[in-house]
Amino acid sequence: MNIALMSLNTIEDGADVSWLLSTFCVCAAVPLLQYIQTSKEGKDSSTKEGKSKLKKIGRNKLAAIDWGGHDSEGPRDEMEDSWCMRNLNGKLLYFGIFDGHGGAASSTYLKSNLLDFIDQAGMKMCDQVVKGDTLKDYGVDEENPLASAFERADSALLDHLGSLGDPECWSGSTATVCFVSDNHVITANVGDSRAVLGRKGRTVDMSNDHRPVGSSKAGRAEISRIIESGGWVSQMRVCGILAVSRAFGDYEFKGGRAELLQEFESTGASGIGTLERPPVVALPDVRVYERSEEDDFLVIATDGLWDVMNSAQAITFVRSMMKRDSTYKMHDVASALVERAIKSRTQDNVSCIVVDLRSSQL
């Protein structure tokens, strides 16, 4: 798992996760805690990195924040996206976006269950980052508690899917989650649902798009990993089938590899590999970013938005909307972003969460 450190705040053991807000369009004002990951500040699409010195926000100075979420089926007949927010004992906010494929079984399961697998070990890692400790026990090349949590969640999901009939048993899903504290933001993602931070005129991508497309460094790394596992890429898809290279579920690329390979061999297909190892994995990229007084908005969305709007355009849209009318709530902004994606003729479901980080500043 790749880890990049920028900073974090504190997480308490035994946090209350008993309630969940997940509705078609909802907003809330709740205390903020934030986590972010990366050894370097993420990509900046509008200015070069390291040009301005970041100012830290005082620890344990939590304030109420505004956030909102909205979704739409778009042109699709079925809604496969899911999203959620949880307030962890007033000390940490958890946001999750899940883009399902092959049905909604996987995304629905992750919305309800993924956080349960991020147990005390994962929270301990988050707590270390929040306190400013190094990740000496969880290095970039070592097993990370969040990676372990995702792995266990994927195993449980595959068992769950195995109890379902066609076609749900073949479903899969992306997952992008963000933990927000007063001083940091932690993101962990699998797939191509994206988290983006607006920071004083700049745009910071807080997640990697896991797609087998060679136009980016991350994409080339995914292609290499797939080939090394015995897989192959055809028409920018894993084995010519799946558009994302990391995902939860998708049994045929994991426990069902032998059957999948046999099916390809029976057709006389050329250029196929051995599928010695799973070419599709649920291993997350984890990033930790330090909060700054320059932070504006956090946007987390499925690719139904990102297919028609890039990261900088989304942040500019949010800023422009708030500049026109500062009384807008984040659920208004999330709804407007989804509507813009639909008007831009997205071909997918669209789900979006917007968090106003300005309201948590001193």
Residue ranges and their predicted role:
Residues 1-362:
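PP2C/PPM-type serine/threonine phosphatase catalytic domain
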